[in-house]
Amino acid sequence: TNGPKLFQLYIHKDKGLTDNLIERCKKYGFKSMCLTVDAVVAGNRERDHRTGFSTPPRLTLDSLLSFALHPTWSLNYLFRKKFELSNVIHTTDKGSKIDQSVMNYMNEQFETKMNWSDAEYCVKKWGGPFALKGVMSVEDAKKAIDIGCTAIIISNHGGRQLDGSRTPFDQLTEIVD
């Protein structure tokens, strides 16, 4: 696209990978960056557990029936380019041979002990418009501005990852200044 681009960043346990993503965004003309802090671990998606959803799919009687009833989808799955995490495939084999779910990748590779100094480091390394996504309180909103964020995004990751948290709408009246 020729329009302005925003990159949504997650901090990885491998800080070199995080740095590499930021540098590549600069190189390829991204205009702003957003650090996501509201989903550092994969959510417990109960519906996916009930339905047996997984990536890659497990072959069960139900899934084989679904494959048979959806031949176009099945052929696309079998013959299309295999899934890979394009942003990290060049730096780690964890982004290539995805025989694990994306959820497992998140849980193994994303930094779960992120803190304010990590966020501030990313703001400074980026050096441009920077949003913090996942702000849940007035204190966090103020701290985000203090470390140099130019925007905040009030989020509970669409409720898909954090379905037990407060909704952004419920937080809005407290945070709006």
Model feature map: region roles:
Residues 164:
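Shared catalytic-loop signature of beta/alpha-barrel
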